[in-house]
A protein has these predicted regions:
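Sec-dependent N-terminal signal peptides
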Residues: 4-14
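Generic marker of residues within folded, mature protein domains
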Residues: 9, 18, 29, 43, ...
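Short glycine/proline- and aromatic-enriched beta-strand/turn motifs that initiate or cap beta-hairpins
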Residues: 17-59, 190-194
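Short structured motifs
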Residues: 22-24, 75-77, 146
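Surface-exposed strand-loop-strand hairpins of Gram-negative outer-membrane beta-barrel proteins
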Residues: 30-40, 65-66, 131, 135-138
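Gram-negative (and chloroplast) outer-membrane scaffold detector with strong preference
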Residues: 43-127
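Outer-membrane beta-barrel transmembrane domain signature
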Residues: 88, 93-194
Length: 194
């Protein structure tokens, strides 16, 4: 797996030397296993193809549910697990219908691959700082496939809405679960364009 990661980094670096346009985005992700946010950097190789880097943070929350305690008249969370995922994906976007429709509406297909780190915090410790001192983590290979639409704003910034699927499987199960992938909804806001 280390050779594959090194190969991806070399390909990314050599292909990005002649890039014409660079874009940075902030992403908000709503997945069936939780929620997250991310940072995205893309460089256009052609007018309809870009490559880049996609850094994400997921807080896994799918097995939790509220329980009402009538004695204290409060809700508590049952099944709480402190699992964090940190994907580092190398991505490519292919923009459909380049030059055929108005520039303010740009559909695209995206594919990403790379390592991700899964971190399991100790749920028995209530202190946030102490909880993350004694963690178990593992690194695995993940991938993502999706599609979306960029909407250009008159100010020059771009908003994007997309749907996709993450493949995030771990080698050693965490809380008897080995697949943290699934569908996601992506909201993207462009923060910089060079």
């Amino acid at each position: 797996m280390n050779k594959a990661i090194i190969l991806l980094i070399v390909i990314f670096m050599t292909n990005s030397v002649n890039a014409q346009e660079k874009i940075q985005n902030i992403n908000f992700l709503f997945a069936n296993n939780g929620y997250g946010f991310g940072y995205e950097y893309e460089k256009f190789q052609k007018s309809n193809v870009s490559i880049g880097l996609d850094l994400r943070f997921y807080d896994v929350r799918n097995d939790e549910y509220p329980i009402y305690d009538p004695f204290y008249n409060q809700f508590t969370v049952a099944g709480e697990k402190d699992i964090l995922l940190f994907p580092l994906f190398f991505k490519t976007n292919y923009y459909l219908f380049d030059g055929q429709i108005a520039n303010s509406f740009r559909p695209y297909v995206t594919f990403s691959i790379g390592p991700f780190i899964a971190v399991d915090g100790d749920e028995t410790i209530s202190s946030f700082a102490k909880k993350w001192r004694s963690t178990e983590s593992q690194t695995n290979l993940g991938a993502s496939l999706g599609f979306g639409v960029n909407f250009s704003q008159p100010s020059g910034n771009t908003l994007s809405l997309g749907l996709g699927y993450d493949h995030l499987s771990v080698d050693k199960p965490i809380h008897s679960k080995d697949d943290f992938g699934g569908g996601y909804l992506l909201l993207k806001y462009q923060i910089n364009r060079e």
